[in-house]
């Protein structure tokens, strides 16, 4: 899905919402930031396989979409902290039923595999 879909007023609401969280890492970043503000290094450590470049790109897109707030502190060493905005918390809350559905689906898959044995 293209980034323009996130701003297209002629698409359904679900499509517009998915466009904002599209990509491999954004839902995980939302989930991590739900627990409170994090520095980029902390986010990378908690997301194995996430490169610095991709993390930076995802956080910039999430900031542009109003989901995260970036706070840069004027101190040495430089310190940057990301946190969810109220809009980002709203999205995280809206994703909870989808997460519950995903867990139920995984349970069904595990049960089906057990029965196949």
Predicted features and spans:
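Basic amphipathic alpha-helical segments that dock to polyanions
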Residues: 55, 59-62
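Beta-hairpin "wing" of winged helix-turn-helix
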Residues: 63-83
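Amphipathic alpha-helical dimerization/coiled-coil segments
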Residues: 90-117
